[in-house]
Amino acid sequence: MNAQKGFTLIELMIVIAIIGILAAIAIPAYTDYTVRARVSEGLTAASSMKTTVSENILNAGALVAGTPSTAGSSCVGVQEISASNATTNVATATCGASSAGQIIVTMDTTKAKGANITLTPTYASGAVTWKCTTTSDKKYVPSECRG
């Protein structure tokens, strides 16, 4: 008797089906991961802005309204990101446009799903605390912005 060598057609079809199922699960998960990584870049870009705003608030002893060009505001000295100096994933990052010291980061619409992150400072008892909020899909933003 001759011993069978190699794989039968049904065995190959089963292996291909298993690979297809794994790919169907892995590709969407990887896509979500890459978007989250890009949105995290926006939070990283805002960290230097947060440091400058926190120092200004502590020096003034209060939140002071105004933009980076307004003398004495909480945003003085902040390096904003505009369309002219945007990064691959961060479209804009502004300070003080909505309220005193507030930082709004807008992500690229195609690569980072247009996520928006708003960082709002509060000053109490000599300490500055930050609250991160978003109107974007929660699965794309860092955990500290999901609450």
Curated annotation (Swiss-Prot):
Which stretches of the sequence are propeptide? Answer: 1-6
Offer an example of a GO molecular function term for this protein: DNA binding
Q: Does the keyword Translocase apply?
A: no
- Which terms in the GO cellular component ontology are assigned? cell outer membrane; periplasmic space; pilus; plasma membrane
User: Which intervals of the chain form a coiled coil?
Assistant: none
> What upregulates it?
Is maximally expressed in the late stationary growth phase (at protein and mRNA level). Minimal comP expression levels are detected in the middle of the logarithmic growth phase.
Name of the protein this chain belongs to: Pilin-like competence factor ComP
Gene name for this UniProt entry: comP
